[in-house]
């Protein structure tokens, strides 16, 4: 099988490539250049996809004895990930750029090019598993990335390979060391790769500008003025610019954002609880939409907890009733449905949250 391996320059994708080679496949490595600006997309050990990372990936490819290329996806990345991120925050939403990158770059633009060039599959260093075409959580639950892959269609999954999903991270590092890969001890990336400083508010402010509005409490009392709803997210407690806690001394949190009026609503922690969710643009990983209610568990953050729920497709909307309330759920977040399974929870579907109740 001809396999293209997306090599970020980190230990995970490096071991993924090594395993594909060891399995006897015809392997080619590719690193995605995602920034057209001078320098890198990150500073220090933060982020990913820098020139240093490309060099690390090339050195791993040399050790493995496989061809290696750098492909420029900077324009596509800016349009489909960065611009989408900025526009979503301007609408008062809270997007996950890693979800968008997987959906629109790695498993769309990159995978399409790979197939057009005659490759049979695209392998990545994601912590997830595929069994009989079904996407499941990784063995290492702390590193599991099935959430950010849940937007993939059945056709995209058919051409995907996740070689390290059955192995804990510590063992991946040990394997890299045994193979003599210099990235064995390389630090993991955590930050948004296109925000080098880690200051999301400043990044957004530089692109959206000042759009003043008010911060109000449940009674409609104006507590403060702000420079734009992009500086807030549901559940936020710090940096609200308001004069202290509520009348009863309890902390106040962002409970709602109205981008049209520029109003940020604050309340107490109880106001953050939701019992139902509505999501649009649903994707069912099996390729078949359900005809009735689905018993499932729901996850709304990449490394968040889960809640038991019942989901039902009504038209183009995925409606979810939670058996246990969730807190701080924001429009724009990705909603992922799982089926509990001792062999590894199976991803059933994903959608973009549009409303909560």
Swiss-Prot record:
User: Which protein are we looking at?
Assistant: tRNA-specific 2-thiouridylase MnmA
Report the EC number(s), separated by commas if there are several: 2.8.1.13
Task: Supply one GO CC term from the record.
Answer: cytoplasm
The question of whether tRNA-binding is a record keyword is answered with: yes
| Chain's gene name | mnmA
Which GO biological process categories is it annotated with? Answer: tRNA wobble position uridine thiolation
Q: Tell me the function of this protein.
A: Catalyzes the 2-thiolation of uridine at the wobble position (U34) of tRNA, leading to the formation of s(2)U34.
Entry's family note = Belongs to the MnmA/TRMU family.
Which residues of this UniProt protein bind ATP? Answer: 6-13, 32, 125
Q: Which domain of life is it from?
A: Bacteria
Q: Please write the reaction equations for the catalytic activity of this protein.
A: S-sulfanyl-L-cysteinyl-[protein] + uridine(34) in tRNA + AH2 + ATP = 2-thiouridine(34) in tRNA + L-cysteinyl-[protein] + A + AMP + diphosphate + H(+)
MF terms from GO for this chain are: ATP binding; tRNA binding; tRNA-uridine 2-sulfurtransferase activity
- Specify where the region named Interaction with tRNA lies, as residue ranges: 143-145
Q: What class of enzyme is it?
A: transferase
The family database entries (InterPro entries) matched by this protein are listed as: MnmA-like (IPR004506), MnmA-like_C (IPR046885), MnmA-like_central (IPR046884), MnmA-like_central_sf (IPR023382), Rossmann-like_a/b/a_fold (IPR014729)
Question: Subcellular location, in the record's words?
Answer: Cytoplasm
The answer, when asked if Transferase is one of the entry's keywords, is yes
């Amino acid at each position: 099988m001809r396999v293209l391996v997306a090599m970020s320059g980190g230990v995970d994708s490096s071991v993924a490539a090594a395993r594909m080679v060891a399995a006897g496949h015809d392997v080619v490595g590719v690193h995605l250049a995602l920034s057209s600006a001078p320098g890198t997309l990150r500073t220090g050990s933060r982020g990913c996809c820098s020139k240093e990372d490309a060099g690390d990936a090339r050195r791993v490819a040399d050790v493995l004895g496989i061809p290696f290329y750098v492909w420029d996806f900077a324009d596509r990345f800016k349009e489909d990930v960065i611009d989408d991120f900025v526009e979503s925050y301007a609408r008062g939403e809270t997007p996950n750029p890693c979800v968008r990158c997987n959906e629109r770059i790695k498993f769309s633009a990159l995978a399409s090019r790979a197939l057009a060039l005659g490759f049979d599959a695209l392998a990545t260093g994601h912590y997830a598993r595929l069994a009989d075409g079904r996407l499941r959580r990784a063995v290492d639950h702390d590193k599991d990335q099935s959430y950010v892959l849940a937007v993939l269609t059945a056709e995209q999954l058919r051409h995907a390979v996740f070689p390290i999903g059955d192995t804990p991270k510590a063992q991946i590092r040990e394997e890299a060391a045994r193979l003599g890969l210099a990235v064995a001890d390389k630090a993991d990336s955590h930050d948004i790769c296109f925000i080098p400083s880690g200051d999301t508010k400043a990044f957004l402010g530089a692109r959206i500008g000042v759009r003043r509005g008010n911060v109000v409490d449940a009674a409609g009392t104006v507590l403060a003025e702000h420079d734009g709803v992009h500086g807030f997210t549901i559940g936020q407690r710090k940096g609200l610019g308001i004069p202290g806690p509520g009348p009863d001394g309890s902390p106040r949190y962002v409970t709602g954002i109205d981008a049209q009026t520029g109003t940020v609503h604050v309340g107490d922690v109880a106001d953050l609880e939701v019992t139902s969710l509505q999501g649009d643009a649903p994707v069912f990983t099996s390729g078949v939409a359900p005809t009735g209610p689905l018993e499932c568990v729901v996850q709304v953050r990449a490394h968040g907890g889960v809640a038991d729920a019942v989901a039902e497709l009504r038209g183009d909307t995925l409606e979810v009733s939670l058996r246990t309330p969730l807190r701080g759920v924001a429009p724009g977040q990705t909603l992922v449905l799982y089926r509990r399974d001792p062999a590894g929870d199976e991803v059933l579907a994903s959608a973009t949250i549009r409303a909560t109740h």
